[in-house]
Amino acid sequence: MSQPNSQQPTIVKCPTCQNKVVWNTESEFRPFCSKKCQMIDFGEWADEEKSIAGAPDMSDSDGWSSEPY
C-alpha cells in the first residue's frame, strides 16, 4: 500500500532580498518575507524605478492636440 502524497510547501524567493518564503495563507506579506521588503518594493514602483514595458508615450509630434474637437 502506498502512502499518501505529502505535499511539500511551495517556496519562493522574496523579490527584494531573495530570502526563502513559504507560499501559504500564513505568509502575510507574500511574496515578500517582511513588511520592510514589501515597502521597499512599493517605493521602487512609486519612484518609477520599476515599470512594465508598454507603448512609448505620445509626443507633440504624434498629432495630439489640446484643442477640443
Curated annotation (Swiss-Prot):
<feature type="binding site">
    <location>
        <position position="37"/>
    </location>
    <ligand>
        <name>Zn(2+)</name>
    </ligand>
</feature>
<keyword id="KW-0479">Metal-binding</keyword>
<dbReference type="GO" id="GO:0008270">
    <property type="term" value="F:zinc ion binding"/>
</dbReference>
<dbReference type="GO" id="GO:0008657">
    <property type="term" value="F:DNA topoisomerase type II (double strand cut, ATP-hydrolyzing) inhibitor activity"/>
</dbReference>
<comment type="similarity">
    <text>Belongs to the DNA gyrase inhibitor YacG family.</text>
</comment>
<dbReference type="Pfam" id="PF03884">
    <property type="entry name" value="YacG"/>
</dbReference>
<dbReference type="InterPro" id="IPR013088">
    <property type="entry name" value="Znf_NHR/GATA"/>
</dbReference>
<comment type="subunit">
    <text>Interacts with GyrB.</text>
</comment>
<feature type="binding site">
    <location>
        <position position="33"/>
    </location>
    <ligand>
        <name>Zn(2+)</name>
    </ligand>
</feature>
<comment type="function">
    <text>Inhibits all the catalytic activities of DNA gyrase by preventing its interaction with DNA. Acts by binding directly to the C-terminal domain of GyrB, which probably disrupts DNA binding by the gyrase.</text>
</comment>
<feature type="binding site">
    <location>
        <position position="17"/>
    </location>
    <ligand>
        <name>Zn(2+)</name>
    </ligand>
</feature>
<protein>
    <recommendedName>
        <fullName>DNA gyrase inhibitor YacG</fullName>
    </recommendedName>
</protein>
<feature type="binding site">
    <location>
        <position position="14"/>
    </location>
    <ligand>
        <name>Zn(2+)</name>
    </ligand>
</feature>
<dbReference type="InterPro" id="IPR005584">
    <property type="entry name" value="DNA_gyrase_inhibitor_YacG"/>
</dbReference>
<dbReference type="GO" id="GO:0006355">
    <property type="term" value="P:regulation of DNA-templated transcription"/>
</dbReference>
<keyword id="KW-0862">Zinc</keyword>
